[in-house]
Amino acid sequence: MTDIKDIQKIIVLDYGSQYNQLIARRIREFGIFSELRSHKVTADEVRAINPIGIVLSGGPSSVYAEDAFDIDKEILDLGIPVLGICYGMQLLTEKLGGKVVPAGQTGNSEYGQSTLHLTENSELFKETPAEQTVLMSHGDAVTEIPEGFQLVGKSSDCPYAAIENVEKKIFGIQFHPEVRHTEYGNAILRNFAFNVCKAKGDWSMDSFIDMEIEKIREQVGNRKVLLGLSGGVDSSVVGVLLQKAIGDQLTCIFVDHGLLRKGEGDQVMEMLGGRFGLNIIRVDASKRFLDLLAGIDDPEKKRKIIGNEFVYVFDDEASKQKGVDFLAQGTLYTDVIESGTETAQTIKSHHNVGGLPEDMQFELIEPLNTLFKDEVRTLGTALGMPDEIVWRQPFPGPGLAIRVMGEITAEKLETVRESDAILREEIAAAGLNRDIWQYFTVNTGVRSVGVMGDGRTYDYTIAIRAITSIDGMTADFARIPWEVLQKISVRIVNEVEHVNRIVYDITSKPPATVEWE
């Protein structure tokens, strides 16, 4: 088994960008373990973590502001290679004796793509061209670099776009290598990891499994864990991972809240209970949930009600068990980011994060909270799970409640349940189920006039949401062939009662989120 202490790590200190985890993700793609850490981490804590490299992320702060996010200066003296990105470059510049000012005073702020001109050879830019496209997003500027640093690159509006201190192995870049808009961003991060930090690149999903099993066993000991199965990929992967770690100490509670997809309850019991032998208790709490949701149309209230009631159902079931101390969840890193961190604004309270009451009776276990969705699928495959589970469509904890706009009724739920089943059937039949990241239907709550046969109708409008993405942090709408969309539309209108109109959501993320609520 791989010992956590033996795994090479590059840590990313969080200074507030919504896309900070992309840095860690890119590094993991190179076969190097990486994770986000608070910018408040101390030098002693960094020594204990023992990383081979440190990245200071971007962020919205200004280093000259009174409430600027700071760094323990001793971290810069540990002899560990450091890469400062955007705000991270400005921070290390200010800490080491350079000067940062509002860009308008001496230069220009930059937002968008720009051309980087390299002025010196550098390990950081090895095998990249002298001129390359990068994404800038800064309002402040470095006007004086610290002693011992040299200029490596500049742009037309940024005189210090890349700097380095070779002796101390400290590098600063004013642009964002983690985003796709930076042409050689991956190469730059790879150079930092391998050329500067001397990474081996020997971390894999098998290593992650070993590490998580060790962490789970250390945290749980001989105590018992409850896992809520939602029917989605995430909780299913957590279940198999936990069983591998602690065996019969795990009890899975499958709460049927009346908000599941068509046939989902029976599929969960058959696949995870039958094929994988998980101990699953099925609880029919549909009336309990739907009664509480009656008359509620605010999406945040719906999420909170479902999150709270879900835990109360667990409390009821846990009271029948003995020695249960932990609640496991399939929280992903995208869930955590969308719910906000100490440096990032909350986008929406997430079903696995923000809906839990403060007096919850369990400690949390969230083994997937550093992974993106595609990494969870890779993990599931590494655990020996079949494609029908691993490639199952993502499903939020609140279920169809957040795919019904406005008040939830049995009639609305049925329109989503049946239309979603048709959508999934036709996407699979067209061979698109591996190409489209996520797809589902939404009852918009809007009624419109239609004609069916010789009669006038006034029924619901169903929206189809289908996206393509790499990691779920950003997404674009899927270009489904028109003939496939037409077939889906015709089937839904003809086979699903109380629906007379279909629309297709062509909004990217951002500005929209994947789910409608």
Curated annotation (Swiss-Prot):
Binding site for ATP: 230-236
Enzyme's top EC category: ligase
Record: active site: 86 (nucleophile), 176, 178
Pathway info: Purine metabolism; GMP biosynthesis; GMP from XMP (L-Gln route): step 1/1
GO cellular component labels: cytosol
PROSITE patterns reported for this sequence: GATASE_TYPE_1, GMPS_ATP_PPASE
Known EC number: 6.3.5.2
Record GO terms (molecular function): ATP binding; GMP synthase activity
Domain Glutamine amidotransferase type-1: 9-202
Reaction(s) catalysed (UniProt annotation): XMP + L-glutamine + ATP + H2O = GMP + L-glutamate + AMP + diphosphate + 2 H(+)
Gene3D superfamilies: 3.30.300.10, 3.40.50.880, HUPs
The entry's keywords: ATP-binding, Glutamine amidotransferase, GMP biosynthesis, Ligase, Nucleotide-binding, Purine biosynthesis
Domain GMPS ATP-PPase: residue ranges: 203-392
Record function comment: Catalyzes the synthesis of GMP from XMP.
Subunit structure: Homodimer.
Protein name: GMP synthase [glutamine-hydrolyzing]
Organism: Streptococcus mutans serotype c (strain ATCC 700610 / UA159)
Lineage of source species: Bacteria, Bacillati, Bacillota, Bacilli, Lactobacillales
Gene that encodes the chain: guaA
